């Protein structure tokens, strides 16, 4: 069956339908990872977006247990070629069946390099995936321009708290769309991790007397999370060590008077170099974000840049002055991607006093 990807600038790509045949409008973003497509599909940070995989052949090893949440989150999936015969001793099915099961539409057989070039040059834009051959551009384009993702954190956060038992330090993990490997990375280091819904009050979290607080990744515009920002102000005022990544990094900055802005096309992939400003050392990081903290709006008495992106000079991390708080824009837990920066979990544990 034919499928069509229609961009808000009027560009139309014609390909083959994969997964569900329902029609969707979403923000179109691209990911440059060569592997780890299942982790990408199950990353809650992609809620409200349709993902273009720039690597030309996707699905070679099928669906395996390597999932970062219980379900896939993108609105749509866009690939050059989808493997129809996955082969792996852990394979439990194909991407085609996985997308169909979860009612996610997609399109294959289009020039994803040309599509990515458009997004790089013109910036991230909205688009529609449809199987309707009688589509009307005059009707569709205004809808694409009007579409916004809104506050999607409420969609991806857990509904109730849950605990991963451990014998070491007690960590409160605020779930703004947390990938599984964040809690696993802490738990593997002995920590007992309590995962809290995004709108849990600071009073409830502090009342549990955690040794540290972790703020997770998540989707969307951080400025939409106004209620959460107010709670983070209270957590900042406490003496509890805090480690934040991705959306948590941005929300903590907003809670302390800094500003954020939307990037032209964001950072999404497993090969982004970041520089530690304290040592000069460069790490290859996994990233998935479309917003960034404006360092010019930082009060130097409150926070200072700790990491910077080598490619474009944007902020990749902050150290908070006089506080046991540090935040990063990238994913130290990887999945998918390199684990160069996984040592940051060890640093967080040392900040809490270390596991005995």
Protein language model features and the residues they cover:
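Active-site glycine-centered loops adjacent to acidic/histidine catalytic or metal-binding residues
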Residues: 111, 246, 289, 331
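Proline-centered loop/turn at the N-terminus of a beta-strand
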Residues: 105, 170, 241-243, 259, ...
């Amino acid at each position: 069956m034919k499928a069509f990807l229609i961009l808000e600038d009027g560009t139309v790509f014609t390909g083959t339908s994969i997964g569900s045949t329902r029609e969707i409008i979403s923000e179109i973003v691209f990911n440059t990872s060569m592997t780890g497509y299942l982790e990408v599909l199950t990353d809650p940070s992609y809620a409200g977006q349709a993902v273009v995989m720039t690597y030309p052949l996707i699905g070679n090893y099928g669906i395996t247990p390597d999932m970062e949440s219980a379900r896939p989150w993108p609105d749509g999936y866009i690939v050059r070629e989808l493997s129809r015969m996955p082969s792996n001793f852990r394979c439990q099915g194909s991407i085609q069946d996985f997308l169909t099961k979860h009612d996610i539409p997609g399109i294959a057989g289009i020039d994803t390099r040309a599509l990515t070039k458009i997004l790089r040059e013109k910036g991230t834009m909205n688009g529609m995936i449809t199987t309707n051959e009688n589509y009307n551009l005059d009707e569709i384009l205004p809808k694409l321009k009007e579409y916004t993702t809104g506050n999607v954190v409420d969609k991806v956060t857990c509904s109730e708290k849950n605990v991963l038992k451990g014998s070491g330090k007690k960590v409160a993990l605020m779930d703004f769309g947390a990938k599984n490997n964040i809690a696993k990375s802490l738990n593997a280091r002995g920590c007992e991790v309590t995962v809290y819904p995004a709108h849990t009050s600071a009073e409830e979290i502090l009342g549990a007397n955690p040794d540290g607080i972790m703020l997770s990744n998540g989707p969307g515009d951080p400025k939409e999370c106004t209620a959460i920002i107010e709670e983070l102000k209270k957590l900042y005022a406490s003496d509890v060590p805090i480690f934040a990544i991705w959306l948590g990094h941005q929300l903590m900055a907003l809670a302390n008077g800094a500003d954020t802005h939307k990037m032209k096309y964001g950072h999404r992939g497993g090969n982004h170099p970041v520089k530690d400003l304290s040592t000069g050392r460069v790490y290859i990081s996994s990233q998935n974000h479309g917003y960034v903290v404006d360092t010019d709006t930082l009060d130097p008495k409150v926070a200072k840049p700790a990491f910077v992106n080598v490619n474009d000079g944007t902020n990749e991390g902050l150290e908070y002055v006089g506080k046991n708080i540090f935040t990063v824009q990238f994913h130290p837990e990887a999945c998918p991607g390199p684990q160069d920066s996984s040592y940051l979990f060890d640093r967080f544990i040392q900040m809490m006093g270390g596991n005995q």
